[in-house]
């Protein structure tokens, strides 16, 4: 498995049988490198969304139309995407598992909101915010937490799914910060590898993973902090 960080919470996950984008926020993402777009959309099979905020839905509509990739998201967000012309949708909701060829995706809780704001400034709810647990046939289990704070039922995510790779938001203000994210990883999970995200993009969130890395000192988990465009092999 190759996991490429694309800035903010966007990732490209490549296995022998699937090419997946998670939360593909490219346009307007200060951290995204424009030259990456063609490489990470070539042969794309799936787009997975954790929630409906613009910095996570990102370029989903355009990419789905360009590539024909299947989009998985919560039910309300899928209904909205359908109205935008996205044809191949896999709607679900918290607790549900959907089989997608060589892997399955399970919607788990996240403590966050999920909405789009229209031109009149009104915020319209787009279902629950979620984390996503991906179980692959021949690869490590991956848990993208989405945007969230720490919560005690993370213990159940570990018990039920035993994720080996954690993608963890650490930027503070809109998600948990680095110290709390490290506490979540150490108290509730047995990750072999943790990859921090949701930092270093907008100036009002944390710019580096230093606090998270310091909080993980002494843990058995490998903390991987790739540069934007860098790859973690798992």
From Swiss-Prot:
Q: Please indicate if the UniProt record lists Magnesium as a keyword.
A: no
SUPFAM superfamilies named in the record: Metallo-hydrolase/oxidoreductase
Entry-linked InterPro entries: Metallo-B-lactamas (IPR001279), RibonucZ/Hydroxyglut_hydro (IPR036866), UPF0173 (IPR022877), UPF0173_UPF0282_UlaG_hydrolase (IPR050114)
The molecular function terms in GO held by this entry are: hydrolase activity
Parts of the chain that traverse the membrane = none
Alphabetical list of Pfam families matching this protein: Lactamase_B_2
Enumerate the Gene3D superfamilies for this protein.
Answer: Ribonuclease Z/Hydroxyacylglutathione hydrolase-like
In terms of superkingdom, the source organism counts as Bacteria
Q: Which UniProt keywords apply?
A: Hydrolase
Q: Which PANTHER family has this protein been placed in?
A: UPF0173 METAL-DEPENDENT HYDROLASE MJ1163 (PTHR43546:SF3), UPF0173 METAL-DEPENDENT HYDROLASE MJ1163-RELATED (PTHR43546)
Against HAMAP family, the record matches this protein to:
UPF0173
What does the sequence similarity comment in the record state about its family?
Belongs to the UPF0173 family.
Protein name stated in the entry? UPF0173 metal-dependent hydrolase Smed_0942
Please give the organism.
Sinorhizobium medicae (strain WSM419) (Ensifer medicae)
């Amino acid at each position: 498995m190759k996991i490429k960080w694309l800035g903010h919470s966007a990732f490209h996950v490549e296995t022998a049988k699937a090419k997946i984008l998670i939360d593909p926020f490219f346009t307007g993402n200060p951290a995204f490198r424009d030259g990456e777009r063609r490489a990470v959309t070539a042969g794309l099979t799936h787009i997975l969304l954790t929630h409906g905020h613009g910095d996570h839905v990102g370029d989903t509509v355009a990419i789905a139309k360009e590539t024909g990739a299947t989009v998985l998201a919560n039910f309300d967000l899928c209904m909205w995407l359908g109205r935008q012309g996205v044809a191949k949708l896999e709607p679900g909701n918290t607790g549900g598992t959907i089989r997608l060829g060589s892997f399955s995706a399970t919607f788990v809780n996240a403590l966050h909101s999920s909405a789009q704001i229209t031109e009149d400034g009104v915020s319209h709810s787009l279902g629950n915010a979620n984390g996503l647990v991906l179980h692959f046939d021949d690869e490590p289990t991956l848990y993208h937490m989405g945007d969230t704070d720490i919560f005690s039922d993370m213990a159940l995510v570990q018990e039920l799914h035993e994720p080996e790779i954690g993608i963890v938001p650490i930027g503070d203000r809109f998600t948990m910060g680095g110290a709390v994210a490290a506490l979540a990883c150490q108290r509730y999970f047995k990750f072999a590898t943790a990859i921090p995200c949701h930092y270093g993009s907008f100036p009002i969130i944390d710019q580096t993973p230093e606090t998270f890395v310091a909080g993980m000192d002494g843990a058995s988990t490998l903390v991987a902090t790739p540069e934007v465009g860098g790859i973690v092999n798992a």
